[in-house]
Regions:
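Enriched for short, Lys/Arg-rich terminal
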Residues: 66-95
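Basic, Lys/Arg-enriched alpha-helical interface segments
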Residues: 1-57, 61
Length: 95
């Protein structure tokens, strides 16, 4: 697996996180955090089985921690699908 795609929900999560970061920490810090997600997306795509399985919550789903957020994804054929990016919320309620 070497490529990934983001669901609309994951794209909305990224926008929400960035807007929050700008308001709370300023544009420079928010941008650094935002771009760090894409580094993690690449890591996930290159080694998708290296990260924690959360099949106990939803079958086939995995989680990669990025800062204070968790990237929720699944492997679908020859690509990784980024499902959502969540913070400290209850993961069970979001999936």
């Amino acid at each position: 697996v070497e490529n990934y795609e983001l669901t609309e929900s994951a794209k909305e999560d990224l926008i929400r996180i960035h807007h929050y970061g700008v308001a709370r920490f300023g544009i420079s810090q928010a941008d650094k955090y935002y771009y760090n997600f894409f580094t993690h997306f690449e890591l996930i795509a290159s080694n998708p089985y290296s990260f924690e399985s959360i099949s106990y919550i939803k079958e086939g789903y995995r989680r990669c921690v990025c800062g204070i957020d968790s990237i929720i994804y699944k492997i679908s054929g020859n690509k990784v699908v980024i499902i959502s990016i969540i913070g400290r919320q209850d993961i069970d309620q979001l999936l």
